[in-house]
Amino acid sequence: MTLLALGINHKTAPVSLRERVVFSQDKLGVALDSLLQQPLVQGGVVLSTCNRTELYLSVDEQENQREQLIRWLCEYHQLRPEEVNSSLYWHQGNAAVSHLMRVASGLDSLVLGEPQILGQVKKAFAESQRGHSLSSELERLFQKSFTVAKRVRTETDIGASAVSVAFAACTLARQIFESLADVTVLLVGAGETIELVARYLRDHNVQKMVIANRTRERAQALATEVGAEVITLAELDEQLVHADIVISSTASTLPIIGKGMMERTLKARRNQPMLMVDIAVPRDIEPEVGKLPNVYLYSVDDLHAIIQHNLAQRKAAAVQAESIVQQESSDFMAWLRAQSAVETIRDYRAQADELRAEMTAKALAAIQQGNDVEAVIQELTHRLTNRLIHAPTKSLQQAARDGDQNRLQILRDSLGLD
Protein backbone atom coordinates (compact mmCIF):
# COMPACT_ATOMS: atom_id res chain seq x y z
CA MET A 1 0.00 0.00 0.00
CA THR A 2 1.14 3.53 -0.75
CA LEU A 3 -0.41 6.99 -0.37
CA LEU A 4 -0.78 9.22 -3.43
CA ALA A 5 -1.89 12.75 -4.26
CA LEU A 6 -2.81 13.62 -7.84
CA GLY A 7 -4.00 17.11 -8.69
CA ILE A 8 -4.18 20.34 -10.59
CA ASN A 9 -4.27 23.82 -9.06
CA HIS A 10 -3.96 27.56 -9.61
CA LYS A 11 -0.18 27.26 -9.90
CA THR A 12 -0.23 24.67 -12.67
CA ALA A 13 -3.31 25.51 -14.75
CA PRO A 14 -5.47 28.49 -15.74
CA VAL A 15 -9.11 28.69 -14.73
CA SER A 16 -10.15 27.65 -18.26
CA LEU A 17 -8.65 24.19 -17.60
CA ARG A 18 -9.40 23.97 -13.88
CA GLU A 19 -13.11 24.46 -14.46
CA ARG A 20 -13.13 21.38 -16.71
CA VAL A 21 -11.90 19.06 -13.94
CA VAL A 22 -14.18 20.31 -11.16
CA PHE A 23 -16.18 17.66 -9.27
CA SER A 24 -19.59 19.16 -8.46
CA GLN A 25 -20.71 18.63 -4.87
CA ASP A 26 -23.98 16.93 -5.83
CA LYS A 27 -22.13 14.29 -7.88
CA LEU A 28 -19.17 13.75 -5.58
CA GLY A 29 -20.59 10.50 -4.20
CA VAL A 30 -20.92 9.10 -7.72
CA ALA A 31 -17.33 10.13 -8.49
CA LEU A 32 -16.04 8.40 -5.35
CA ASP A 33 -17.93 5.21 -6.21
CA SER A 34 -16.41 5.27 -9.68
CA LEU A 35 -12.94 5.93 -8.30
CA LEU A 36 -13.11 3.04 -5.84
CA GLN A 37 -14.09 0.68 -8.64
CA GLN A 38 -10.55 1.02 -9.95
CA PRO A 39 -8.81 -2.24 -8.94
CA LEU A 40 -5.75 -0.57 -7.41
CA VAL A 41 -7.67 1.97 -5.25
CA GLN A 42 -8.25 1.04 -1.59
CA GLY A 43 -9.54 4.42 -0.44
CA GLY A 44 -9.99 7.93 -1.77
CA VAL A 45 -10.87 11.55 -1.00
CA VAL A 46 -11.73 14.09 -3.72
CA LEU A 47 -10.99 17.73 -2.91
CA SER A 48 -12.46 20.13 -5.48
CA THR A 49 -12.46 23.92 -4.99
CA CYS A 50 -12.21 26.96 -7.25
CA ASN A 51 -8.41 26.78 -7.07
CA ARG A 52 -7.69 23.04 -7.03
CA THR A 53 -8.93 19.57 -7.81
CA GLU A 54 -7.01 16.83 -5.99
CA LEU A 55 -7.33 13.10 -5.45
CA TYR A 56 -5.89 11.68 -2.23
CA LEU A 57 -5.60 7.91 -2.49
CA SER A 58 -4.36 4.78 -0.81
CA VAL A 59 -3.51 2.26 -3.52
CA ASP A 60 -1.90 -1.09 -4.14
CA GLU A 61 1.46 -0.25 -5.69
CA GLN A 62 1.57 -1.04 -9.42
CA GLU A 63 3.99 -0.07 -12.15
CA ASN A 64 1.40 1.80 -14.21
CA GLN A 65 -0.60 3.29 -11.32
CA ARG A 66 -0.08 6.87 -12.49
CA GLU A 67 -1.34 6.12 -15.99
CA GLN A 68 -4.38 4.27 -14.61
CA LEU A 69 -5.43 7.15 -12.38
CA ILE A 70 -4.89 9.85 -14.99
CA ARG A 71 -6.91 7.76 -17.44
CA TRP A 72 -9.77 7.55 -14.93
CA LEU A 73 -9.67 11.32 -14.30
CA CYS A 74 -9.73 12.09 -18.02
CA GLU A 75 -12.49 9.61 -18.80
CA TYR A 76 -14.63 10.94 -15.96
CA HIS A 77 -14.32 14.52 -17.22
CA GLN A 78 -14.26 13.60 -20.93
CA LEU A 79 -10.78 15.03 -21.46
CA ARG A 80 -7.82 13.84 -23.48
CA PRO A 81 -4.71 13.05 -21.37
CA GLU A 82 -2.59 15.43 -23.44
CA GLU A 83 -4.90 18.28 -22.39
CA VAL A 84 -4.02 17.91 -18.69
CA ASN A 85 -0.76 15.96 -18.42
CA SER A 86 1.50 19.01 -18.28
CA SER A 87 -0.67 20.63 -15.57
CA LEU A 88 -0.98 17.62 -13.26
CA TYR A 89 1.24 17.03 -10.25
CA TRP A 90 1.88 13.70 -8.56
CA HIS A 91 3.06 13.06 -5.00
CA GLN A 92 3.75 9.69 -3.42
CA GLY A 93 4.52 8.55 0.13
CA ASN A 94 6.01 11.27 2.31
CA ALA A 95 5.54 13.87 -0.45
CA ALA A 96 1.79 13.12 -0.56
CA VAL A 97 1.55 13.33 3.24
CA SER A 98 3.39 16.66 3.35
CA HIS A 99 1.29 18.02 0.49
CA LEU A 100 -2.02 17.36 2.25
CA MET A 101 -0.72 18.88 5.49
CA ARG A 102 0.43 21.97 3.58
CA VAL A 103 -2.90 22.25 1.77
CA ALA A 104 -4.94 21.90 5.00
CA SER A 105 -2.74 24.52 6.70
CA GLY A 106 -3.21 27.02 3.88
CA LEU A 107 0.46 26.87 2.85
CA ASP A 108 -0.37 25.87 -0.72
CA SER A 109 -3.27 28.29 -1.20
CA LEU A 110 -3.47 31.19 -3.61
CA VAL A 111 -3.74 33.30 -0.45
CA LEU A 112 -1.01 32.03 1.87
CA GLY A 113 -2.49 30.87 5.16
CA GLU A 114 -6.15 31.43 4.22
CA PRO A 115 -8.42 29.49 6.62
CA GLN A 116 -11.26 28.54 4.24
CA ILE A 117 -9.33 25.65 2.72
CA LEU A 118 -9.35 23.70 6.00
CA GLY A 119 -13.15 23.69 6.00
CA GLN A 120 -13.13 22.53 2.38
CA VAL A 121 -10.71 19.69 3.20
CA LYS A 122 -12.88 18.65 6.15
CA LYS A 123 -15.95 18.68 3.90
CA ALA A 124 -14.21 16.46 1.33
CA PHE A 125 -13.13 14.09 4.11
CA ALA A 126 -16.68 13.94 5.51
CA GLU A 127 -18.04 13.06 2.06
CA SER A 128 -15.65 10.10 1.85
CA GLN A 129 -16.63 9.06 5.37
CA ARG A 130 -20.31 9.04 4.39
CA GLY A 131 -19.53 6.99 1.31
CA HIS A 132 -17.29 4.54 3.22
CA SER A 133 -14.51 5.47 0.81
CA LEU A 134 -11.68 5.73 3.34
CA SER A 135 -8.92 3.27 4.11
CA SER A 136 -7.62 3.26 7.69
CA GLU A 137 -4.35 4.87 6.55
CA LEU A 138 -6.15 7.63 4.67
CA GLU A 139 -8.47 8.33 7.59
CA ARG A 140 -5.50 8.60 9.95
CA LEU A 141 -3.71 10.93 7.51
CA PHE A 142 -6.61 13.36 7.27
CA GLN A 143 -7.18 13.42 11.03
CA LYS A 144 -3.48 14.11 11.48
CA SER A 145 -3.63 16.89 8.88
CA PHE A 146 -6.44 18.61 10.78
CA THR A 147 -4.27 18.54 13.89
CA VAL A 148 -1.34 19.98 11.95
CA ALA A 149 -3.51 22.79 10.55
CA LYS A 150 -4.63 23.67 14.08
CA ARG A 151 -1.01 23.75 15.27
CA VAL A 152 -0.01 26.02 12.39
CA ARG A 153 -2.94 28.33 13.14
CA THR A 154 -2.22 28.58 16.89
CA GLU A 155 1.59 28.42 16.98
CA THR A 156 2.35 30.83 14.12
CA ASP A 157 1.08 34.19 12.83
CA ILE A 158 0.05 32.71 9.49
CA GLY A 159 -3.51 34.00 9.94
CA ALA A 160 -2.66 37.36 11.48
CA SER A 161 -3.66 39.44 8.46
CA ALA A 162 -7.10 38.81 6.96
CA VAL A 163 -6.46 37.95 3.32
CA SER A 164 -8.55 35.71 1.08
CA VAL A 165 -10.05 35.61 -2.38
CA ALA A 166 -13.08 37.38 -0.90
CA PHE A 167 -10.85 40.00 0.69
CA ALA A 168 -8.99 40.49 -2.59
CA ALA A 169 -12.26 41.04 -4.45
CA CYS A 170 -13.29 43.69 -1.95
CA THR A 171 -9.84 45.31 -2.06
CA LEU A 172 -10.19 45.61 -5.83
CA ALA A 173 -13.55 47.34 -5.41
CA ARG A 174 -12.07 49.81 -2.92
CA GLN A 175 -9.20 50.58 -5.30
CA ILE A 176 -11.53 51.38 -8.19
CA PHE A 177 -14.24 53.28 -6.29
CA GLU A 178 -13.24 56.13 -3.99
CA SER A 179 -16.08 55.34 -1.61
CA LEU A 180 -18.09 52.15 -1.34
CA ALA A 181 -20.83 53.98 0.53
CA ASP A 182 -22.24 55.42 -2.69
CA VAL A 183 -22.27 52.30 -4.88
CA THR A 184 -24.76 49.50 -5.39
CA VAL A 185 -23.26 46.02 -5.06
CA LEU A 186 -24.90 42.93 -6.53
CA LEU A 187 -23.71 39.64 -5.02
CA VAL A 188 -24.56 36.51 -7.01
CA GLY A 189 -24.68 33.35 -4.90
CA ALA A 190 -25.01 32.75 -1.17
CA GLY A 191 -22.15 30.39 -0.36
CA GLU A 192 -19.21 30.78 1.99
CA THR A 193 -17.20 33.12 -0.26
CA ILE A 194 -20.15 35.46 -0.83
CA GLU A 195 -20.80 35.46 2.92
CA LEU A 196 -17.24 36.69 3.51
CA VAL A 197 -17.59 39.34 0.80
CA ALA A 198 -20.93 40.56 2.18
CA ARG A 199 -19.60 40.92 5.72
CA TYR A 200 -16.50 42.74 4.50
CA LEU A 201 -18.61 45.17 2.44
CA ARG A 202 -20.95 45.78 5.36
CA ASP A 203 -17.94 46.58 7.56
CA HIS A 204 -16.78 49.10 4.92
CA ASN A 205 -20.05 51.04 4.88
CA VAL A 206 -21.67 49.72 1.71
CA GLN A 207 -25.21 51.03 1.97
CA LYS A 208 -26.87 49.18 -0.90
CA MET A 209 -26.36 45.43 -1.33
CA VAL A 210 -28.48 42.97 -3.29
CA ILE A 211 -28.01 39.20 -3.05
CA ALA A 212 -29.18 37.11 -6.01
CA ASN A 213 -29.56 33.38 -5.42
CA ARG A 214 -31.39 30.42 -6.92
CA THR A 215 -33.64 30.29 -3.84
CA ARG A 216 -34.54 33.17 -1.55
CA GLU A 217 -34.47 30.99 1.57
CA ARG A 218 -30.73 30.26 1.36
CA ALA A 219 -29.85 33.94 0.95
CA GLN A 220 -32.31 35.42 3.45
CA ALA A 221 -30.31 34.77 6.63
CA LEU A 222 -27.21 36.41 5.16
CA ALA A 223 -29.27 39.31 3.79
CA THR A 224 -30.77 39.93 7.22
CA GLU A 225 -27.31 39.90 8.79
CA VAL A 226 -25.77 42.43 6.39
CA GLY A 227 -28.85 44.49 5.58
CA ALA A 228 -29.20 43.40 1.96
CA GLU A 229 -32.11 42.87 -0.40
CA VAL A 230 -32.75 39.37 -1.80
CA ILE A 231 -33.73 38.49 -5.36
CA THR A 232 -33.79 35.24 -7.33
CA LEU A 233 -31.57 34.50 -10.31
CA ALA A 234 -34.64 34.92 -12.51
CA GLU A 235 -34.64 38.62 -11.54
CA LEU A 236 -30.94 39.06 -12.29
CA ASP A 237 -31.39 40.59 -15.74
CA GLU A 238 -33.48 43.52 -14.49
CA GLN A 239 -31.35 44.07 -11.36
CA LEU A 240 -28.01 44.31 -13.21
CA VAL A 241 -28.89 47.74 -14.53
CA HIS A 242 -28.72 49.16 -10.99
CA ALA A 243 -25.41 47.50 -10.04
CA ASP A 244 -22.08 49.34 -10.03
CA ILE A 245 -20.23 46.30 -8.71
CA VAL A 246 -21.07 42.64 -9.39
CA ILE A 247 -19.29 39.90 -7.44
CA SER A 248 -20.32 36.37 -8.38
CA SER A 249 -19.58 32.98 -6.83
CA THR A 250 -22.09 30.19 -7.43
CA ALA A 251 -21.81 26.44 -7.98
CA SER A 252 -23.43 26.66 -11.42
CA THR A 253 -21.87 24.51 -14.12
CA LEU A 254 -22.85 27.06 -16.80
CA PRO A 255 -22.38 30.85 -17.01
CA ILE A 256 -25.17 32.85 -15.37
CA ILE A 257 -24.32 36.22 -16.90
CA GLY A 258 -23.77 36.27 -20.65
CA LYS A 259 -22.65 38.80 -23.21
CA GLY A 260 -26.17 39.45 -24.49
CA MET A 261 -27.49 40.12 -21.01
CA MET A 262 -24.67 42.60 -20.36
CA GLU A 263 -25.16 44.38 -23.69
CA ARG A 264 -28.77 45.09 -22.67
CA THR A 265 -27.62 46.17 -19.21
CA LEU A 266 -25.01 48.60 -20.51
CA LYS A 267 -27.50 50.14 -22.89
CA ALA A 268 -29.97 50.69 -20.05
CA ARG A 269 -27.18 52.13 -17.85
CA ARG A 270 -26.17 54.48 -20.66
CA ASN A 271 -22.70 52.89 -20.55
CA GLN A 272 -21.92 53.81 -16.95
CA PRO A 273 -18.88 51.67 -15.97
CA MET A 274 -19.30 48.42 -14.05
CA LEU A 275 -16.82 46.38 -12.04
CA MET A 276 -17.47 42.63 -12.30
CA VAL A 277 -15.52 40.10 -10.25
CA ASP A 278 -16.07 36.42 -11.09
CA ILE A 279 -14.64 34.22 -8.34
CA ALA A 280 -16.50 31.07 -9.37
CA VAL A 281 -15.02 27.96 -10.97
CA PRO A 282 -16.53 27.11 -13.43
CA ARG A 283 -16.96 30.77 -14.30
CA ASP A 284 -20.31 32.49 -13.72
CA ILE A 285 -19.66 35.28 -16.24
CA GLU A 286 -18.87 34.60 -19.89
CA PRO A 287 -15.28 35.75 -20.64
CA GLU A 288 -16.57 37.70 -23.67
CA VAL A 289 -18.27 40.11 -21.25
CA GLY A 290 -14.83 41.50 -20.43
CA LYS A 291 -14.46 42.73 -24.01
CA LEU A 292 -17.48 45.03 -23.74
CA PRO A 293 -16.79 48.76 -23.31
CA ASN A 294 -17.17 50.10 -19.75
CA VAL A 295 -17.06 46.62 -18.21
CA TYR A 296 -14.06 45.78 -16.03
CA LEU A 297 -14.17 42.00 -15.58
CA TYR A 298 -11.78 40.18 -13.25
CA SER A 299 -11.55 36.40 -12.74
CA VAL A 300 -10.01 34.40 -9.91
CA ASP A 301 -6.69 34.43 -11.73
CA ASP A 302 -6.78 38.23 -12.07
CA LEU A 303 -6.95 38.58 -8.29
CA HIS A 304 -3.51 37.04 -7.96
CA ALA A 305 -1.62 40.36 -8.16
CA ILE A 306 -3.76 41.90 -5.42
CA ILE A 307 -3.26 38.89 -3.21
CA GLN A 308 0.52 38.94 -3.69
CA HIS A 309 0.59 42.39 -2.11
CA ASN A 310 -0.74 40.95 1.15
CA LEU A 311 1.70 38.04 1.45
CA ALA A 312 4.67 39.80 3.02
CA GLN A 313 3.37 39.55 6.61
CA ARG A 314 2.80 35.83 6.27
CA LYS A 315 6.08 34.68 4.76
CA ALA A 316 8.04 34.60 8.01
CA ALA A 317 5.22 32.68 9.69
CA ALA A 318 5.16 30.27 6.75
CA VAL A 319 8.76 29.24 7.42
CA GLN A 320 7.77 28.24 10.95
CA ALA A 321 4.66 26.50 9.64
CA GLU A 322 6.71 24.50 7.11
CA SER A 323 8.87 23.28 9.99
CA ILE A 324 5.76 22.01 11.79
CA VAL A 325 4.60 20.21 8.63
CA GLN A 326 8.01 18.60 8.15
CA GLN A 327 8.05 17.31 11.73
CA GLU A 328 4.47 16.04 11.63
CA SER A 329 4.86 14.37 8.23
CA SER A 330 7.96 12.54 9.48
CA ASP A 331 6.02 11.36 12.54
CA PHE A 332 3.17 10.15 10.36
CA MET A 333 5.48 8.26 8.02
CA ALA A 334 7.09 6.57 11.04
CA TRP A 335 3.61 5.47 12.16
CA LEU A 336 2.81 4.28 8.64
CA ARG A 337 6.00 2.22 8.43
CA ALA A 338 5.20 0.68 11.80
CA GLN A 339 1.84 -0.48 10.45
CA SER A 340 3.60 -2.77 7.99
CA ALA A 341 4.86 -4.79 10.98
CA VAL A 342 1.45 -5.05 12.68
CA GLU A 343 0.29 -8.08 10.69
CA THR A 344 3.62 -9.85 11.18
CA ILE A 345 3.50 -9.20 14.94
CA ARG A 346 -0.10 -10.43 15.05
CA ASP A 347 0.83 -13.64 13.21
CA TYR A 348 3.87 -14.18 15.45
CA ARG A 349 1.79 -13.81 18.61
CA ALA A 350 -0.89 -16.13 17.24
CA GLN A 351 1.75 -18.74 16.43
CA ALA A 352 3.20 -18.47 19.95
CA ASP A 353 -0.25 -18.75 21.55
CA GLU A 354 -1.05 -21.80 19.41
CA LEU A 355 2.22 -23.44 20.45
CA ARG A 356 1.58 -22.63 24.12
CA ALA A 357 -1.92 -24.11 23.94
CA GLU A 358 -0.62 -27.25 22.22
CA MET A 359 2.19 -27.81 24.73
CA THR A 360 -0.08 -27.06 27.71
CA ALA A 361 -2.70 -29.54 26.50
CA LYS A 362 -0.07 -32.29 26.15
CA ALA A 363 1.36 -31.55 29.59
CA LEU A 364 -2.06 -31.62 31.28
CA ALA A 365 -2.89 -34.88 29.54
CA ALA A 366 0.38 -36.41 30.78
CA ILE A 367 -0.33 -35.27 34.34
CA GLN A 368 -3.87 -36.70 34.20
CA GLN A 369 -2.37 -40.02 33.13
CA GLY A 370 -0.38 -40.08 36.38
CA ASN A 371 3.04 -38.99 35.12
CA ASP A 372 5.33 -37.21 37.53
CA VAL A 373 4.48 -33.49 37.51
CA GLU A 374 8.08 -32.31 37.75
CA ALA A 375 9.09 -34.56 34.85
CA VAL A 376 6.16 -33.31 32.77
CA ILE A 377 7.14 -29.67 33.40
CA GLN A 378 10.75 -30.40 32.46
CA GLU A 379 9.61 -32.05 29.23
CA LEU A 380 7.22 -29.14 28.53
CA THR A 381 9.90 -26.47 28.91
CA HIS A 382 12.41 -28.50 26.88
CA ARG A 383 10.04 -28.98 23.94
CA LEU A 384 8.75 -25.41 24.12
CA THR A 385 12.29 -24.05 24.06
CA ASN A 386 13.24 -26.18 21.06
CA ARG A 387 10.13 -25.17 19.13
CA LEU A 388 10.60 -21.46 19.88
CA ILE A 389 14.26 -21.31 18.87
CA HIS A 390 13.96 -23.54 15.80
CA ALA A 391 13.08 -20.84 13.22
CA PRO A 392 15.51 -18.18 14.58
CA THR A 393 18.30 -20.80 14.68
CA LYS A 394 17.75 -21.66 11.00
CA SER A 395 17.80 -17.96 10.09
CA LEU A 396 21.06 -17.45 12.02
CA GLN A 397 22.67 -20.43 10.31
CA GLN A 398 21.59 -19.23 6.86
CA ALA A 399 22.89 -15.70 7.53
CA ALA A 400 26.23 -17.16 8.64
CA ARG A 401 26.45 -19.34 5.50
CA ASP A 402 25.69 -16.27 3.35
CA GLY A 403 28.28 -14.19 5.18
CA ASP A 404 25.57 -11.60 5.83
CA GLN A 405 26.85 -9.76 8.91
CA ASN A 406 24.08 -7.15 8.79
CA ARG A 407 21.37 -9.81 8.96
CA LEU A 408 23.24 -11.58 11.75
CA GLN A 409 23.34 -8.35 13.76
CA ILE A 410 19.65 -7.68 13.12
CA LEU A 411 18.81 -11.18 14.34
CA ARG A 412 20.99 -10.73 17.44
CA ASP A 413 19.20 -7.45 18.18
CA SER A 414 15.79 -9.05 17.60
CA LEU A 415 16.61 -11.89 19.97
CA GLY A 416 17.93 -9.50 22.64
CA LEU A 417 21.43 -11.00 22.59
CA ASP A 418 23.24 -7.62 22.72
Curated annotation (Swiss-Prot):
Keyword terms, alphabetized: NADP, Oxidoreductase, Porphyrin biosynthesis
Catalytic residue list: 50
Binding site for NADP(+): 189-194
GO BP annotation list: protoporphyrinogen IX biosynthetic process from glutamate
Entry text on domains: Possesses an unusual extended V-shaped dimeric structure with each monomer consisting of three distinct domains arranged along a curved 'spinal' alpha-helix. The N-terminal catalytic domain specifically recognizes the glutamate moiety of the substrate. The second domain is the NADPH-binding domain, and the third C-terminal domain is responsible for dimerization.
Subunit structure of this chain's protein: Homodimer.
Protein name as annotated: Glutamyl-tRNA reductase
Species, as recorded: Pectobacterium atrosepticum (strain SCRI 1043 / ATCC BAA-672) (Erwinia carotovora subsp. atroseptica)
Gene assigned in the entry: hemA
